Every structure is written in C-alpha cells, then in structure tokens.
Swiss-Prot record:
Its main location: membrane. Interacts with MAS1. Interacts with ARRB1. Interacts with FLNA (via filamin repeat 21); increases PKA-mediated phosphorylation of FLNA. Residues 56-61, 126-141, 217-239, 305-359 are cytoplasmic. Changing P285A: Decreased binding to eprosartan inhibitor. CDD domains: 7tmA_AT1R (cd15192). Residues 335-359 are annotated as: Disordered. This is Type-1 angiotensin II receptor.
Amino acid sequence: MILNSSTEDGIKRIQDDCPKAGRHNYIFVMIPTLYSIIFVVGIFGNSLVVIVIYFYMKLKTVASVFLLNLALADLCFLLTLPLWAVYTAMEYRWPFGNYLCKIASASVSFNLYASVFLLTCLSIDRYLAIVHPMKSRLRRTMLVAKVTCIIIWLLAGLASLPAIIHRNVFFIENTNITVCAFHYESQNSTLPIGLGLTKNILGFLFPFLIILTSYTLIWKALKKAYEIQKNKPRNDDIFKIIMAIVLFFFFSWIPHQIFTFLDVLIQLGIIRDCRIADIVDTAMPITICIAYFNNCLNPLFYGFLGKKFKRYFLQLLKYIPPKAKSHSNLSTKMSTLSYRPSDNVSSSTKKPAPCFEVE
C-alpha cells in the first residue's frame, strides 16, 4: 500500500497510489478463516499450558517460568485476533476506532518481541542446564528467571511503543474506506528504516543466531557424550529435536521478516511498482498467519519435549485435578541428562536421560 496524505479540518486523509494492492476476494475469505483457527487452537492450547505449568507442575523450574510467560504473551496477542479477522473480512475496513487500532497493533508487536526474547532466553537456559549444569546452578534460579521475564516484558513493551504512537486510523479518499495503518511522512525516512531494521535485527537476526549457537553447542556436547557411550540412536533423536527447534523458528519468521522489509521500502516510496505492492500486500497476511500460528504453538511444542508435561497435559484433558502435594525437584530440570560433558567427565558410563524436560 503506497500512501500519500493530506490533513483537512484536523482529519488525516490518505491517497492510496495502489488502491487494489492486496485486495483479493480469496484473501478476504481465507485469512479470517485462518485467524479464527489460530484463535481457537491458540486460546485452547496456551490456556492448557498455563494450567498445567502453574497448577500441576507448580512453577518450580527456570524453564517452566519461561514457558509460562511465553503462553501468557501468546494469550495477550490472541485476544486481539478477532479484531484483525473482522478487519480483513470487511475488506480492510477498520470499524473499531483509533484506540483499539493502537492497542491491537501494539499487541502484535509485543507478542513478536516477547516471544522471540523468551525463546532466546530458553535456548540459553537449556545450554547452561545441559552443558554447564554445576557452574550455572547459582545463576539459574527462580528469582533470576522471574526478573529476566519482567525485563523481557518491559523491553517488548518498549519495542511496541512505535505502534501505539504511529499506528492510526486513516481515511483513504480514493477508495472511501477507513483503515488501521502505519503512515510515514515521505520526507522523514529515519523512523520507518529504524523500525524496520529493529524488527529485522532485534526481532529475528540476533535471536536466531543466539538460538542457533546455543543448540549447536548443546548438540556437540550431547554428541560427545553419546559417542563415549556408543548410543547412536539416542544421538540421532537429539539431533532431530534440535534441528526441528532451529528450523521451526527460522521458517516461521523469515517470510514475515522479508515482506516486512519490502513493505517499509514501499511505504518510503523506494518501491513504486503497484505489481510489487500487490504481491507484498497479498503475501503479508499469509506470512503473519505462518509466523503467529507457529508462535502460538511454541509453548505446546517445547512443553511436549518433556515427559512430565506430557503426562500432566493428558491428565488435565481427562479432568484429573492436580495433587495437593507437589513433588520435590532439582532446579536444573527440563534437562534430566545425567551425563555432564563439561562438569563431570568421570560419569561417562551413566545412561543419559531425556534432555529437554520441563520438570
């Protein structure tokens, strides 16, 4: 969408140079349907994750703190998804006013940064728990995890401020519709470039490199352990899990990041071809569905890597209430790996346990 604006009587009015870009009947049907599916699956799955971690597992490990906050961040975003479904079904007509436009937009931005930051911290925590369990015991505490989550929520909130400030309801004169959109003044290119690069670098590139590095080091440590024990099948299983985690993150977000960058170029007028604008505006909601659907599945995905989480989850589905007394647990769990390659060389004869337990 290429926008030109004017102000009359204090009302922001916009001329869209490519009024038909991204406006296809199949988009107006398919995207609201996908949003509805994401909403139902996400609310159901993440609510169960919160119940399992908080009431059944009693929130006793560092990893469970991160997963709980991940599920809560997803729920905050999912509550605004019906607004976007209605907006798309009404052919990009925003009927909810300027206030909800800002709140819903900030929620999308907040979820992006909060989820990515939490997944990054979770990967670092897994690295410390598996590769340096003894050295990291003093750092991997519940207090540190909770403070880290508070900092993440504050940073995500800070990163969402541009959506609150610059996202507004505009009236497009040549199509006679009201939209909820970002609009940048053509003479001020610093802001959109800065926001686009922040989203690409801080919201994807740096976290991906940290996640990739953390899980690569985990795999190398486990590979060494399993080679000593001559346990090749187990080594292959761990490699597949780690590859799934890294690729799951990468392919969920890379399409959205690419088209976000192209959208900024269109907004700035660097790209003026309406055919390219149509491709970007058509692809953008599809990439959002891919990114945020996978994002909302993350708590379930990571949780089901642990046997206890899986057991409690199935127990909840059978309406079995949590026990009054909780089990005692070591603070290093989510990895119950008994072989410690960096801290306990003499334990090479021990049999490794599952390495991604939540509790």
